[in-house]
A protein has these predicted regions:
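Short runs within selected transmembrane alpha-helices of multi-pass transporters and secretion channels
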Residues: 65, 134-153, 160-168, 193-208, ...
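Short alpha-helical transmembrane segments in multi-pass integral membrane proteins
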Residues: 1-15, 72-137, 185-241, 297-364, ...
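Transmembrane helical elements of multi-pass membrane transporters/channels
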Residues: 13-32, 133, 144, 167, ...
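Helix-terminus/linker motif at the lipid-water interface of multi-pass membrane proteins
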Residues: 23, 27-45, 114-121, 177-188, ...
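Transmembrane alpha-helix boundary and packing residues in multipass membrane permease domains
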Residues: 18, 22, 33-34, 70, ...
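Small-residue hotspots at the loop-to-helix junctions and early N-terminal turns
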Residues: 41-52, 127, 131, 266-281, ...
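Generic alpha-helical transmembrane segments of integral inner-membrane proteins
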Residues: 19, 23, 27, 31, ...
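Small-residue-rich hydrophobic transmembrane alpha-helices
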Residues: 44-107, 141-160, 258, 271-335, ...
């Protein structure tokens, strides 16, 4: 077992590249939001609401990536490279099927999707065009997300970082080109942002495939993409399915929050879009350490070091909490800068909401960081994805969403207080999460012996 100083160095070598990847992902969203701010508030709101649909798909990918990551990390810790590649092929096949389903729905029924989130005709029209174009990115996004999660799980974290950097550059360049009509091209507005995302996702896949062809570590192999392995499929489903359900339940709840805000008014939607973007910056560090927890715990369990996995999980929880507090301070420090930047881009009411929303969302991501470290890091890394599914289903859909709905439409509270009720969701489930953590039933070695 590493001493605390060496462990911090080890955890940092895993967490910092993940933080960089999260930062780049956030910067992509920032670039989209900032550039759309130059188009119109309607375009910004349309993109934000349309992305609630893609966010559901991303949560499916995240759940599948969790199954991939946990299994790959444990088998890598055991030293079974062949099984790691089989898991990758299996996950990519499932990802492709889901991507195609979401593509067909968003390409053929974009208007119906947008009407779920808003009743503004202008926002519906702009969001529908956005969805039709961005749907072409789904297959590419699924492949790259699964492939890079497998690499991260075995400690190969540089390629995902490089891939995200290239993707960011491609996305920003394409956004600028299509939004502002550079190089003689027409101005495409919100559609241009979607097209830029498609091109960026294609670049990610090209980098992943290029690495796979040359790699001596883990490769994507066509034979494993089509290979049948009932045992691995069973194990993958056992971990990935609860994780997928967990993330879909969580994402649907966030979509329900967005729908509630959307029906209150575009000012709420625009302010929330910027507030979420800002908070994601502050949450990057704590989420990086939380995600590193999965790798660390899984690999130790794959080596059958139960006590070490338990101790490392405890250390990662402490680190994540401290880092989340630092993130709070960063968000509050940059709040005046954000308000000044958007003052001439949003309505006066939206700016008023934004100033309050930024403060409210800071405490939410502290709770999110702790819960993510435990539910997605410790519990899933230990093979227990079922608990997160149960606790999120109960607390999001029987507590958080109903309370927010009641605040908005029954008690008709002012919009700011509706938002406050919405930000309490992470703390409502935290006591139950800690009880499960201290029981230590989540520590499990799930590897098998294959010939």
């Amino acid at each position: 077992m590493l001493n605390k100083k060496d462990f911090l160095k080890y955890a940092s070598t895993l967490a910092f590249p993940i933080m960089l990847q999260n930062l780049i992902g956030t910067l992509v969203n920032i670039a989209d939001t900032v550039m759309l701010g130059y188009v119109s508030q309607t375009a910004m709101s349309a993109s934000s609401l349309a992305n609630q649909y893609t966010f559901i798909l991303f949560c499916l990918y995240y759940g599948m990536a969790t199954g991939t990551s946990v299994l790959c990390a444990q088998y890598w810790g055991k030293g079974d490279k062949k099984t790691v590649e089989k898991i990758l092929g299996l996950a990519e096949r499932i990802s492709l099927i889901i991507s195609l389903v979401f593509f067909v729905i968003s390409f053929t029924m974009p208007t119906a999707i947008m009407k779920i989130f808003t009743n503004s005709p202008e926002t519906i029209a702009a969001g529908s065009e956005y969805l039709k174009v961005i749907s072409f990115s789904f297959v590419f996004m699924g492949f790259s997300q699964i492939f890079m999660s497998a690499l991260r799980s075995i400690g190969k974290i540089m390629l995902p970082s490089v891939t995200y950097i290239v993707s960011l550059c491609v996305n920003v360049l394409c956004n600028a080109t299509f939004i502002f009509g550079l190089f003689g091209l027409p101005k495409l507005g919100v559609t241009g942002v979607a097209l830029g995302t498609v091109i960026a996702r294609i670049s990610e896949v090209l980098i992943c495939l290029s690495y796979s062809l040359r790699s001596s570590d883990v490769r994507f192999r066509i034979k494993y993409f089509f290979a049948k392995s009932d045992i691995l499929l069973q194990d993958f489903i056992k971990i990935a399915t609860p994780a997928v359900i967990n993330d879909v339940v969580w994402s649907f709840a966030n979509s329900a929050f967005a729908a509630i805000l959307g029906h209150i008014g575009d000012d709420m939607v625009a302010a929330n879009a910027v507030a979420v973007m800002v908070v994601n910056i502050g949450a990057i560090a704590c989420r990086g350490f939380a995600n590193a927890t999965t790798i660390i715990v899984s690999q130790e369990l794959g080596k059958d070091r139960i006590d070490t996995a338990r101790e490392y999980g405890k250390r990662m929880l402490t680190i994540t909490f401290i880092v989340s507090l630092i993130g709070c301070a960063v968000i509050l420090a940059i709040r005046p800068v954000i308000l000044n930047f958007y003052r001439d881009k949003l309505t006066e009411t939206a700016i008023y909401y934004l100033g309050i929303f930024i403060i409210m969302t800071t405490w939410r991501f502290v709770g999110e960081g702790i819960n993510t470290c435990l539910i997605c890091g410790c519990f899933r890394g230990g093979g227990d994805a079922r608990f997160g599914m149960i606790v999120d289903t109960i607390f999001m859909w029987l507590v958080a969403v109903p309370l927010t709905f009641l605040a908005a439409y029954v008690f008709k509270l002012p919009p700011v207080w509706v938002y406050f009720v919405m930000t309490l969701d992470e703390f409502e489930k935290m006591p139950v999460v800690f009880i499960h953590y201290f029981r230590n039933k989540w520590l499990t070695n799930i590897t098998r012996d294959f010939e």
